[in-house]
Amino acid sequence: MTTFLKSLIFLQDSCLAFLSLMFHRGSSEDAAEALKKLETSINGARISFDTTWTREFRSLFIVPLFKCLVAFCLIISLLVFIEGIYMNLVVLYVKVFERKPEKVYRWEAMQEDIELGHETYPMVLVQIPMYNEKEVLQLSIGAACRLIWPLDRLIVQVLDDSTDQTIKELVNTECAKWESKGVNIKCERRDNRNGYKAGALKEGMKHNYVKLCNYVVIFDADFQPEPDYLQHSVPFLVHNPEVALVQARWRFMNANKCLMTRMQEMSLNYHFMAEQESGSTRHAFFSFNGTAGVWRMAAMEEAGGWHDRTTVEDMDLAVRAGLLGWKFVFLNDLTVKSELPSKFKAFRFQQHRWSCGPANLFRKMIMEIIRNKRVTIWKKLYLVYSFFFLRKIIVHCFTFIFYCVILPTSVFFPEVNIPAWSTFYIPSMITLCIVIATPRSFYLVIFWILFENVMSMHRTKGTFIGILERQRVNEWVVTEKLGDALKTKLLPRIGKPSNMFLERVNSKEIMVGIYILCCACYGLFFGNTLLYLYLFMQAVAFLISGVGFVGT
């Protein structure tokens, strides 16, 4: 009705001004005055019409849509919070009641028999996949060969996919050195790199001497186990025939390399403390971390061995074995030294694989999990909802969409109320639970939050690529170890090296940073909350990442 009346007034004023202009016989000043009235009437009507139309469209469509997005994010926030509290309660239960694996499962130290001697020890195969690992090959091979285990019951298998002839010779020299000391070490090579790591592991299992082994241990080239690793882990498999996997925790030797490695340490420590510990305690299932784990050969064979259909062959094998009813044991007290990516580009590629691969595996295995009849309905629910849907998909997307899109955009919608519990209290409690895993880094919590939000953009993109199976879904990342850092590059590497400055610039981070900065400025001048303080910090984090000033 208001629009209709304004239209009538506009027509009336326009007609009067036009008639006055056409038929008025006075001076030219009067004609100019009439023309001015006509122009004013038209401009006023245009502004009135535009304002009215915009407000109505905003109130009828934009605001309700934004409210729906906020409500959806609030629901997801509660689900993430409940999941986090549940995992931490399980960990607390383990600590308070001392429910360590040694008390839950049978464990007895391996001992020699007077008559049989070493025959009481099972045959163990140690696999070390590597690709042009010049800087760490001596460390990794040496650590594997120093494992305390009868030499006649241990086989060390170096799966060398190196393309550099010099590095191949170094591997041969190192293997020959340990062979001369009595270690049964084999160096196996392929004429192709099909399947990458999964392909190398699968090919390594085809050799005749592997059939003599009962268990297989996998160490990536930058992992250095302690000599007593097998003595702590293998007894769980020997005395518990229902156990298929024993996983050790990672310990990071270069965590103090830079601020980025410190924040990675916080995230991964929480992953092991909460996700792996709670999964092992409550469901006897968790994802194999791809290294520092001991597998039962029979379980691997029953599950179908290594598959290279995704970039997370370790998780693929774990899920298939879990669906067959096999149990997994996580040893929080058993640690293996490893390294963290210290370059931002390397870390981005790694996070892409770690987010894209699980999402793609979920797409491929969802129906297989639902139709499975060998595990309980609760374990299937845990796999579908908690393990995959919530932790591997929803968390990544929610973090970016809510904290980097919805919250910044909310400054333009003062009529939409976002409760404080969703923006402050719940995130604070979740963050506190995460920081507990790394107490020494408590003072870095603000930097960790901002950095995790930046990385959530890459994880969200990787998740969608995995779910939709787009072009980069099977992109494999080779991690070249440098002794104290990791250097990552794509395979194959095509073309000439580009400008170093351009390689440091990340346009996506810069664009998101500029948008959040604009929202922060708007909130500062026109908002009535302190949200702009967070937005300014988050914008700076995106912009710093955008120009490559992260990592070494």
Curated annotation (Swiss-Prot):
GO CC annotations on file: Golgi membrane
EC annotation from Swiss-Prot or TrEMBL: 2.4.1.32
Alphabetical list of CDD domains matching this protein: CESA_CaSu_A2
Transmembrane segments: 62-82, 393-413, 430-450, 509-529, 530-550
Family from the record: Belongs to the glycosyltransferase 2 family. Plant cellulose synthase-like A subfamily.
Membrane topology of the entry: Multi-pass membrane protein
Location of this chain's protein in the cell: Golgi apparatus membrane
Residues involved in substrate binding: 220, 222
Organism field: Arabidopsis thaliana (Mouse-ear cress)
Function as written in the Swiss-Prot or TrEMBL entry: Probable mannan synthase which consists of a 4-beta-mannosyltransferase activity on mannan using GDP-mannose. The beta-1,4-mannan product is the backbone for galactomannan synthesis by galactomannan galactosyltransferase. Galactomannan is a noncellulosic polysaccharides of plant cell wall.
Gene: CSLA10
Main location: Golgi
Catalytic reaction list: GDP-mannose + (glucomannan)n = GDP + (glucomannan)n+1
Name by which UniProt lists this protein: Probable glucomannan 4-beta-mannosyltransferase 10
Pfam families: Glyco_trans_2_3
Keywords assigned: Cell wall biogenesis/degradation, Glycosyltransferase, Golgi apparatus, Membrane, Transferase, Transmembrane, Transmembrane helix
Single GO MF descriptor: glucomannan 4-beta-mannosyltransferase activity
